[in-house]
Regions:
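Flexible loop/turn connectors
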Residues: 229-346
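Alpha-helical recognition/docking segments in bacterial nutrient-uptake
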Residues: 61-174, 234-241, 253, 312
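N-terminal helix-turn-helix DNA-binding module of bacterial transcription factors
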Residues: 1-62, 340-345
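Hinge/beta->alpha junction and helix N-cap segments in small-molecule ligand-binding domains
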Residues: 72-84, 102-110, 161-171, 187-233, ...
Length: 346
């Protein structure tokens, strides 16, 4: 039999109004004596009462449900980084009493129907298709739904949360330049996703600080990571004074590919070749020292709730909330040939 507020009130010996005030954290509940509130909460526990959130939302017109719109077909949404971001979001919603409704963007029309049907006022979009991003933005804007994009967005009229990747890659270039590296190669996906563009812009900006340009011949861009091996082998076949001495990879998997290829060619790591990945998803597990960028994935997910509910103003650019990253540097050994007093790649 379903437990009602009246049942709890009878068990606790108080009015139904008092029970409602305590369960809803109403301001009037503070006027109740501590022992009365404790008695009500104990009655709730003993009765096994479960609040009907859907009914409460209909009655009050206030929805505490966040729609999590996911492009499941994209590999990045199923990756390790995405898992940490979503974990942060789920932890935040659980702590603040919000429900989460998972929506698969493979059927956009059905998702839109559900947003209307359940009167959802908050939505977080984790998608990489510009078409999906645009359609979702238009729909939420027309219905006054608070929307936050995660990691990528083609729009500037809704907030985006991610890390400051351009600043991170620029700092890596500075580190490599200080060690004497001049021939710096980039290993990246062949796409125009925002974070790929930002990371590439960061490398270019870092080189520009020292009067250098990103050499297009030292960019390996492929959708399939396996296709990088051909580029890497051609570079490592070059004479030592001509080949790249440092690699900035846009994820740790690609950094591992550079490491594997370099070791096959008998190149000492990190003495003769410096490698940086991104994301800290794999570099920490590698036996050989490979640098990486540690991103605050869980904090990004937690921030989504605050952004949607208007509890934060910590944005670094219009509608962009970018978290600083930590560069985890696998420093060369003391006996390394690549030291601050010797220039590599000249």
């Amino acid at each position: 039999m379903r437990i009602t507020l009246a049942d709890i009130a009878k068990k606790a010996g108080v009015s139904t109004a008092a029970v409602s005030q305590v369960l809803n954290n109403h301001a009037h509940a503070k006027a109740l004596r501590p022992e009365t509130r404790a008695k009500i909460l104990q009655a709730v526990i003993e009765s096994g009462y479960s609040r009907n959130e859907a009914a409460a939302e209909i009655r009050t017109g206030l929805s505490k449900t966040i729609a999590l719109l996911l492009e499941f077909s994209h590999s990045a949404v199923r990756g390790a980084a995405a898992n940490e971001i979503l974990l942060g979001l789920l932890n935040a919603t659980a702590q603040h009493g919000y429900n989460v409704r998972i929506c698969n963007l493979s059927n956009l029309e059905l998702v839109q129907q559900e947003l209307v049907k359940y009167n959802i006022r908050y939505a977080a979009c984790f998608a990489f298709s510009p078409l999906l991003q645009e359609e979702i933005g238009n729909f939420c804007k027309a219905r006054d739904i608070a929307l936050c994009y995660i990691e990528d967005s083609c729009r500037n009229d809704f907030p985006l949360v991610y890390s400051d990747d351009q600043a991170a890659t620029r700092e890596i270039v500075r580190k490599l330049f200080a060690e004497g590296h001049r021939r710096i190669a980039v290993v990246k996906p062949e796409d125009d996703i925002r974070y790929s563009v930002e990371r590439c812009n960061g490398v270019a900006a870092g080189l520009q600080e020292f009067g250098l340009k990103l050499n297009p011949l030292w960019i390996s861009a492929h959708h399939d990571p396996v296709e990088h091996f051909a580029d890497l082998e051609s570079w490592f076949h070059l004479p030592e004074e001509e080949r790249p001495t440092a690699f900035i990879c846009f994820d740790d998997n690609r950094a591992a590919q550079v490491l594997i290829t370099a070791l096959r060619f008998g190149i000492r790591i990190p003495d003769s070749c410096r490698i940086f990945g991104f994301g800290n998803t794999l570099a920490r597990q590698l036996y050989y020292p490979v640098g990486t960028v540690v991103q605050a994935f869980e904090k990004m997910g937690e921030a989504v709730l605050d952004i949607l509910t208007g509890k934060t103003e910590n944005k670094t650019a219009p509608a962009r909330y970018l978290f600083p990253s930590e560069i985890k540097d696998a420093q060369p050994k003391p006996d390394s040939e690549t030291t601050s007093g010797k220039t590599c790649g000249i």
